[in-house]
């Protein structure tokens, strides 16, 4: 056998990799693996095997044309002494995507797409005739027409959409959407299909539905909302007994399964909420008009109607298709003001006191106060049953007419928000129980559940060790209920304290992510054995699925195909995460843009994160978060103590600990990368600083003898 034949046979058996004609490279004992490749800006790329084993390092020179997210085949390289295990990409099996977003640079002969971060070792080359009118500085979406291979070293593409000039607010928000493969405009044919829907309520609709048009009904939403998913109705049935209706827009009546509108809704799976806009799941005609439960208009709804006693115990319920007519559209602020002017103190959990001789103040006050009273009973019972208290505040911006942020603040959930929340939770739980809770020996029919697994035990133990540093104790062993009670006790103890936000953040990291599945395991955070999403079909596709299945089962239909619905659940969970990432990026962009107006200014802050490459700090005044890069900590060589969430100086022993108060200056902003850099003015949390400086004989501003500012620094 010729040597070349032998090498070809060895290549077939994965002992060798063919590099080019008559050229081969030796694999490590023929060990070949498949998995995902992740490109890093610092060149320290990683390969994560499909089998879940330890990720491997892939040097830039061994990465071929692989991009982040690509499925690749690698050969595991022989391990060198004192080196981490490495791999070499030998084949790109599947590219994660074929369109990319960046900034155009047009030159004499060719044009280039410059992508944020480190997409590839070189920019994407675009023939000038494929620019679609794009100019230097424009943001554009480019489709790859040629991947690098043995014959072509460059990555080539063509412009499919020019978004517009860099820096324009609409362009930057659309850029974020495009980077995640999310839609930034609605297909014309889908909008045309929506325009043909009349929204007319027919005599057949009236005959088949329960009529709630004579019962007081209202919506309570954010002041700028247009898509009113849900409404509440209330009337007294007798002494100590109330009928409360949770009425949900009947989207599935208008959006038929498999229709062109439905196919687009499946693809999107969720509405997307950026800082200054909503990208709806459904066409505007449906989400803001036909389906939206607007005041003084007859609307079709799918309702869960409860009979509740004064302790909010469910005495009876029914799930029915209805016709409603909202009497009043409230915003949260209006209802909150009404509650407070009638004696409710927000956050205490106490309902309004008994009315005076003239009754409660405000329009429909008696009914709204009764809804609040019942909601507080529901909330109290939920926490008794083991629900976890995580009241995270939302970062908000005031935006001017040009899209520029003028104010940054946190918005806290108040009693009016919690009123709506509790009835939505009750409806979702009840719908899930109506299908999933069956007699022993029977099999429940298919339904998408919203599931939330128990916390990661190792992360809970890390949390326990972390909070000890602040003087808190926490038990991590025991039942689900015991874990929830321990978490709630910790949240109550640190509420309002300087370290409260950081502790809550570390606690959240111990939690698993909620997701959709037909395989029910319950919901740890809410302490529900059965839970689904039924109450927001205008903005979440799983709710539309649930509406259709409930209708099907009410009509005597058989259980739906499990595999089909599990696939849809996985898709919706994935799209929910993608949408959340886009929302987070829009917040980062506006945060950096806002702080760009404060370059050189000093602020009080606290350390909100510690990594090997730097310290994250959150400004106390406006909650904007930036980073102090490790390269700027030039007074010592710092070691990263991951277990204790801190950096410790080797010579001076200065310590930067998660949660420490700190004084920072705004040093740099980079809108393109959404990066905000700070420098440290003083570390108020370091109790060792003065002592160690004296021991080292170093004055303020001086480096310890023999130290170098660049030594050991890691760039971001």
Identify the role of each PLM range.
Residues 33, 54-56, 85, 100, ...:
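Short beta-strand segments
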